[in-house]
Amino acid sequence: MSMFLDTAKISVQAGRGGDGMVAFRREKYVPNGGPWGGDGGKGGSVIFKVDEGLRTLMDFRYNRKFKAKNGEKGMTKGMHGRGAEDLIVSIPPGTTVRDAETGKVITDMVEDGQEFVVAHGGRGGRGNIRFATPRNPAPEIAENGEPGEERELQLELKILADVGLVGFPSVGKSTILSVVTAAKPKIGAYHFTTIVPNLGMVRTKSGESFAMADLPGLIEGASQGVGLGTQFLRHIERTRVILHVIDMSASEGRDPYEDYLQINKELETYNLRLMERPQIIVANKMDMPEAEENLKEFKEKLAANYDEFDELPQIFPISSLAHQGLENLLEATAELLDQTDEFLLYNEDDMEQEEVYYGFNEEERPFEISRDDDASWVLSGEKLEKLFVMTNMERDESIMKFARQLRGMGVDEALRERGAKDGDIVRIGNFEFEFVD
């Protein structure tokens, strides 16, 4: 049996765009050939793709870094560099992708074949053929390729099941799953026999089918991490109907009704929205002594805690071991599923706001100025830093162009306002230059 892994932290890095080329056309009979340097190719993106054949995040246990290839450099004769192929990373259905730094949900991937770009490849730098103007017909300017997007991601697998079996350990959840589906969960007469979720397909006599998950047993304090804690509570979130399994024989000395209240409390504490899901109470082990009396007492306590006009949850007495009462339970479950819509897993506050990768917010200041300990001025900011890394600092014309761009952004004026003097050191990353007033 393969090891079950339902969380992983990984890093992804898209490819850098290829550098543009500085070249000139030098051919016989072609005087003043002009610029001929082509653009660099686009860097490869990192794309997640859902593969329904995968069931866990085990592939990410040892392989935690994913890096796409860089685009090729531009070439002479105005030829563009080849764009790099995208890196396709397969993930199981039901995977939620979060930004590890902010915790925001980037995407929730559930459909087979669904794709999502988690890191965009950098744009290729422009060659000098792009910078020719009537005033400068032979520019020695070309851009470096844009760096690819890089980010840390948190992956969470929440299995795709229509129905979830919940309850205390050893109440018979795994036995129910093994009887009504072809799944073969581990079954034993001790607590926490089930330590990973098990999934099976149910088919009723009337022809209805649905996916059922047996989740590891919950105990008091599970929502705070006691026992197996929240490690597997996340798998209940995608279910539409909850089958609340209770040991009606009270074989371990617990009160069945107190068990019922305690499990609901844990579900509510973990995620209030779990209590929106309809529940069917499964009174298991009805073939045991005192089960009938306990069920009668359970119903009385349940009714006493509901208002007169509230609808009581359905209760189905069964014996999974003796295969009694299961058909009625499954038919009722299928009927309830038909009446229940899917629940919204995340609201807008959970989701990361989608942004245009190459765009900039007009309202945001394109740069920031700070003072270092050595009295030098430090320039930072996404737009400014992107212009810097795409500037070829080995060519004078490119440096002059970058200086004009800084002036156009208002950097010179802002430095003067902050008190910068002629000859002061200004730093962008590891690059230093003198401020000229």
UniProtKB/Swiss-Prot annotation:
Residues 127-146 are annotated as: Disordered. Its EC number is 3.6.5.-. The keyword Disulfide bond does not apply. Monomer. HAMAP family: GTPase_Obg (MF_01454). Belongs to the TRAFAC class OBG-HflX-like GTPase superfamily. OBG GTPase family. This is GTPase Obg. It comes from Streptococcus thermophilus (strain ATCC BAA-250 / LMG 18311). The gene is obg.
